[in-house]
Amino acid sequence: AAATPQYDSEGNLKLDNLLTSTAISIKQGNVWEPLDDAASIKDGTQVQVEIVYSVPANAFPDGGNTATYTLPAGVYPKGDLSGNITDSTGMIIGTFALSKKSPTVTFTFSNDTSRTFTGTFKFNTTINYAETGGDGKIHLGEKTYTVEPEYSLNTKKEHTLSEDKSKVSYTVTVNAPNGTHDQTVTITDRLAAENTA
């Protein structure tokens, strides 16, 4: 049974419950290969997000031709994007627009919306662990992907010699540019036994 059309507060058709398939793909050579439904993806990986939707006949309000879709956290665009959307035959049926770091995609259709049609929307982005709110999950349609956080620590150790050259003071600076993802980080700084006399 076809899903009942739903509308946002501005009267735009919502595609969120009209999806027929979704995929997150990674590039293998020159080809985008869809990941398995429960795949893990490393933070910072370049991916292609794809949704396929089926719009029932006359789903748009009178005179309307715009629809929206809410992207899941973790795959928000890293810049403003726009482009064409196609039907199941590859024919252009309208355009999409996305704003940097916004979850809402806006579609403007130019095809005959009085008949049922299927459309495909794709865009490329970078997986972002921090956007997932700390649980590391991306929920796209009925699929859930796990983001593996990318850990990195930068350390720096500097020393200062006292004026009388009898003491050395050390300063150790540690920073985590990608955050610690709620993981405990333990730093140990020891002098070798032969250097303690």
Feature-to-residue mapping (PLM):
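Serine/threonine-rich, low-complexity linker/repeat segments that form flexible spacers/stalks
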Residues: 2-59, 125-184, 188-193
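A surface/secretory-pathway sequence property marking extracellular, secreted
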Residues: 3-32, 70-109, 193-197
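Short proline/glycine- and polar residue-rich coil/turn motifs
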Residues: 40-43, 97-102, 110-117
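Generic local-structure boundary detector
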Residues: 58-60, 78-82, 118, 179
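Carboxylate-rich, polar loop motifs that coordinate divalent cations or form catalytic acidic clusters
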Residues: 67
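Short, hydrophobic beta-strand segments
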Residues: 108-113, 119-130
